[in-house]
Amino acid sequence: MSPVLFEIKDSIGFITFNRPDKLNSFNREMALLMQEKLDACKSNEVRCVYITGAGKAFSAGQDLAEVADPNGPGMKAILSEQFNPIVIKIKKLEKPVVAAINGVAAGAGANIALCCDIVIAAESASFIQAFSKIGLIPDSGGTHVLPRLIGWQKASALMMLGEKVSATEAEKLAMIYKVFPDEIFAEEAMKIATTLAQMPTKGLAYTKQLLKNSVNTLFEDQLHDEDIVQQKAAQTKDYKEGVNAFLEKRKPEFKGE
C-alpha cells in the first residue's frame, strides 16, 4: 500500500498520509512521494488541495526509527531533501491548500499543517511541537510560521515546553481556522474544500501570493503590489464572469481561468 494516497475528484486534489500503523510518520519514501503528489496538484485540473491523514493521526512527523538507522538518511538530508521541499511546494502552489487535521499533528507533521492556507481540525485532534523533548529545534518552517500565527511569547512556550495543544485551544489561539465536532468533521471539511474548488482559482492564488509576501513588505510597498496584482486579477475570465453574474443576478460559474 502506498504511504501517500492521491486522487483528483471534483477539482480537488486529495492527498492522504497513509501509514496509519506508524501514526503517518514520515520516512524518506513517504516524503518524496508527498513531493510528487504536490507537484501533480499543479495541474489545472486541481483547483484546491486537501491534505489529511488515514487512521487516528494526521502525522506524527519524522519516523524516528529511520533517524536511528545508521544506514538511513542524515539530518541534513531529512530536512533539505525531504521536509523543506514539502513546505516550500505547499507555499508555492498557486491554489488554496486545506489541511484537515483528523488526529494528532506532531513535530514536522504539525508544521506541514500550519504551512497550509486553511487549517481545520476535528475536536479530538491536537498539535504538539515535540522537538524539544528529544533535543531538536522545530523545523519544517515552524519557527517562521508559528510566531506569526500566535505571537512570540506563546510560540516560544509551546516550542520550548513541548506542550500539547488541543484543537479547541488551537482555534482560540488563531493557530487554526476552525474546529468541528468529530462526527461532522469530514463533512464540514469537504464543504470548505468544495467551496474553494468552485471559486476563482487565480484570484485565490493572487491573494495567497500577497499574503505570503506581506510578511516582509512595508505598507506602502504592499499597496503598490496590490495595485499590480489587482490589474492582473481584473484580466481573468473568472473576474468577468463574477461581474456579469452579479449584474445578471445569477450564480457565477467560475472555471479557474
Model-found features: residue ranges?
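Crotonase-fold acyl-CoA enzyme core
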Residues: 89-204, 235-236, 241-244, 250, ...
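Helix-loop "lid/cap" segments that line or gate small-molecule binding pockets
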Residues: 158-160, 210-214, 229-234
